[in-house]
Design a protein with these regions (language model features):
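Conserved glycine-rich Rossmann-like NAD(P)H-binding loop of the short-chain dehydrogenase/reductase
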Residues: 29-46
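Active-site helix of classical SDR
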Residues: 120, 156
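C-terminal helical subdomain
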Residues: 173-176, 180, 197-235
């Protein structure tokens, strides 16, 4: 039996990596999924079709820059109902602090903090009306452990986690759950420019997507923060 039949989800960062895996996993359980990314064009990678409300069990594609308030409002209004939002949009550049770029830091804050805030706000506004829903934020284990060359990324992810904690308290009276999945090393395109790491020891995006499905289909409990790491630990 498909556990999410009759529900609608919006996934940011849905063109690749964890976001794309989550979109596929949710659709496999019967959800209608609108997968969004600033790398996508409306209706598909070539922009040759309008945004289509997804049928149950299907994924529709749409462009979305999560830091663009007007576009976020538009996208959130395109689903007939909104049961689940997965904030998986992310960007990361890495290097020692002595070489840190303020422009790159600002971009990461725009995506991970501003973008998450805007998406969470629009999700909460809609979910409050029905007094139910679930917002999942794909965070990072860097909030718990210091890694060299990750200062700007860590700052952005810590901001996102702080936002999620406050959101969880504000959403609770409306029966809306908020979850932060603090992911360890996962084999996604964020590692493409970082040679020297053994990606065979990393988790696959599908592993996190499977875990996400296991918690969003359990309305009798609220998983608010959880660290998910590969068996090898920090890589």
């Amino acid at each position: 039996m498909k556990r999410l039949l009759g529900t609608f989800a919006l996934v940011t960062g849905g063109s690749s990596g964890i976001g794309a895996a989550c979109a596929r996993a949710l659709a496999a359980e019967g959800a209608g999924v609108l997968a969004c990314s600033r790398r996508l064009r409306d209706g598909g990678p070539h922009g040759d079709a309008p945004v289509r409300v997804p049928n149950l069990g299907e994924v529709s594609l749409a462009h979305l820059d999560v830091a663009d308030e007007a576009e976020v409002r538009q996208r959130f209004g395109e689903l007939p109902e909104l049961d689940l939002v997965v904030c998986a949009a992310g960007v990361g550049t890495f290097g020692p602090i002595v070489n840190a770029s303020v422009a790159e830091l600002r971009e990461m804050l725009e995506v991970h903090v501003v973008g998450t805030l805007v998406c969470a706000r629009e999700a909460l506004r809609r979910m409050q009306l029905r007094r139910k829903g679930h917002i999942v934020m794909i965070g990072s284990h860097v909030v718990n452990e210091a890694f060299t060359e990750c200062a700007s990324y860590t700052a952005a992810k810590m901001g996102q986690l702080g936002l999620a904690r406050v959101l969880a308290e504000e959403a609770r009276p409306f029966n809306i759950r908020v979850t932060s999945l603090l992911a360890g090393a996962t084999d996604t395109p964020i590692w493409d420019d970082r040679p020297g790491f053994d990606r065979s020891k990393m988790m696959k995006p599908e592993t996190l997507a499977s875990f996400l499905v296991s918690i969003v289909t359990r309305p009798e409990m609220s998983v608010e923060e959880v660290v998910i790491r590969p068996p090898a630990g920090a890589l």
